[in-house]
Amino acid sequence: MATASRKKKKVKVTPEGTVHIKASFNNVMVTITDTLGNTVSWSSAGKNGFKGSKKNTPYASQVTSEAAAKEAYDLGMRYVDVLIKGPGSGRDAAIRALQGVGLEVRSIRDITPLPHNGCRPPKRRRV
């Protein structure tokens, strides 16, 4: 017996929120939350069709950021604070894409965790 497909609830969100951008060496993830921290929309490079080494390019970061921002903009979000984490290559492209969609960026903070001489880093690549 087939069950009826459920429609997603379209809930209006507050016009303010936070964009969390995690740009690692291998991937880019963008999560947009409201002021309470509830997820409004999210996107990643893999979700947008990028595979392998193409996931860590600035273009993949731009497409990923646009996808998450459009969804949040359609739900009523207008002003965002940006939190960036990680050393990835697409950090700047992601912020420019947010502004291109129409979200007004109020502040940008870098929250990349830095060790106070903790674990030994991976060995250097010899190419």
UniProtKB/Swiss-Prot annotation:
Residues of the signal peptide: none
Keyword Chloroplast: no
Keywords: Ribonucleoprotein, Ribosomal protein, RNA-binding, rRNA-binding
GO MF assignments: rRNA binding; structural constituent of ribosome
One GO term of the biological process aspect: translation
Pfam family, one: Ribosomal_S11
Record's GO cellular component terms: ribonucleoprotein complex; ribosome
Top-level lineage group: Bacteria
Entry keyword annotation includes RNA-binding: yes
Cited function: Located on the platform of the 30S subunit, it bridges several disparate RNA helices of the 16S rRNA. Forms part of the Shine-Dalgarno cleft in the 70S ribosome.
Annotated PANTHER family: 40S RIBOSOMAL PROTEIN S14/30S RIBOSOMAL PROTEIN S11
Family: Belongs to the universal ribosomal protein uS11 family.
Subunit structure: Part of the 30S ribosomal subunit. Interacts with proteins S7 and S18. Binds to IF-3.
Name the UniProt record assigns to this protein: Small ribosomal subunit protein uS11
Organism: Chlorobaculum tepidum (strain ATCC 49652 / DSM 12025 / NBRC 103806 / TLS) (Chlorobium tepidum)
